[in-house]
């Protein structure tokens, strides 16, 4: 089963989905992982109800970082900003389908961090192990925008 997921990761790394930048996005953010050099830039367009209508990302990164963001962007259409902010790191880990070592966790979570930061309009709180801050607090932060 791990082989199937490894093939999926390599496919998303070689041909990432939603790769590029949207013109005139409603939300935008970029960040990097200074430990390994991964960089990602996310653009998001919202519909009239404030839900993700279209999302794109670009940048450079390792296979785990690129594949995780590619897989994640496939899942976000129709979600509200609040729903995006509540996504746990386990959601990304399930999408990847393989065990991620502690040293690669920041690679796997970079896309989620950048997408949450775009949704907040500011850097998302992020703990060292790659977990986003308290989702309830993130939702409260959104209300102050």
Annotate each language-model stretch with its function.
Residues 50-59:
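Immediate flanking context of iron-sulfur cluster ligation sites
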Residues 36, 59-67:
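Short, thiol/selenol-centered motifs that function as redox-active sites or metal-ligating centers
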């Amino acid at each position: 089963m791990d082989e199937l997921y490894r093939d999926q990761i390599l496919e998303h790394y070689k041909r990432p989905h939603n790769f590029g930048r949207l013109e005139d996005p409603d939300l935008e953010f970029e960040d990097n992982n200074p430990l390994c050099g991964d960089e990602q830039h996310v653009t998001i367009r919202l519909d009239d109800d404030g839900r993700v209508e279209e999302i794109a990302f670009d940048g450079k990164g390792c296979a785990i970082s690129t594949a995780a963001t590619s897989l994640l962007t496939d899942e976000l259409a129709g979600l509200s900003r609040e729903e995006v902010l509540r996504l746990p790191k386990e959601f990304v880990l399930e999408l990847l389908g393989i065990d991620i070592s502690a040293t690669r966790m920041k690679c796997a979570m970079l896309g989620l961090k950048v997408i949450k930061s775009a949704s907040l309009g500011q850097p998302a709180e992020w703990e060292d192990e790659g977990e986003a801050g308290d989702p309830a607090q993130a939702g409260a932060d959104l209300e102050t925008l």
